[in-house]
Amino acid sequence: MGYTEDIILIQRGRRENMSDKPRRWKAVGVLDIGSNYVRMGIYQAGKGGAQRLELLEHPLRIGHEVFTSGRISVETVRRLSEILRGYSQVMKEYGVTEYRAIATTALREARNRAYVVDQLKTQNNLVVE
C-alpha cells in the first residue's frame, strides 16, 4: 500500500471531469508542508472570492526528524514526494494551473532544506516556497 492511499480526506467536493467543464472561475491549489501533516486545499476562485472545494491531509512527522536530528531523512523525502505526487494528480483532476506550495518551520529549519526542495522540484515539478 502506498502512502498516497493513506491520505485523509477531510472535505471532498465533486471532481469528476472537473478539468473538462467550461466555467467562470478557476481552481487553485494551496499545499502546506507542515511539521506533522502535509495538507492540500483546492479552492474555487472567482470575482466573488474563494470557496474551498476539497481539503486533504496526510500525517508526516517532518518536525520530529528536524527537531531531533536537524535533517530530513531520505526516506521522509521519498514519502513526501509520493504524497505530493498524489496531490498533483488531484490538482490535475480539478484543472488547477496555479498553486502555492508553502513549507513551514520544520522544512525551513532543516540543514538539508536545499536538497529537499531540489528533490521536490526534480521529482514532482513543484516549487516550494
Roles of regions detected by a PLM:
Residues 2-33, 41-129:
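Nucleotide/phosphate-binding catalytic cleft detector across ATP-hydrolyzing
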Residues 36:
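Primarily the dimerization/phosphotransfer
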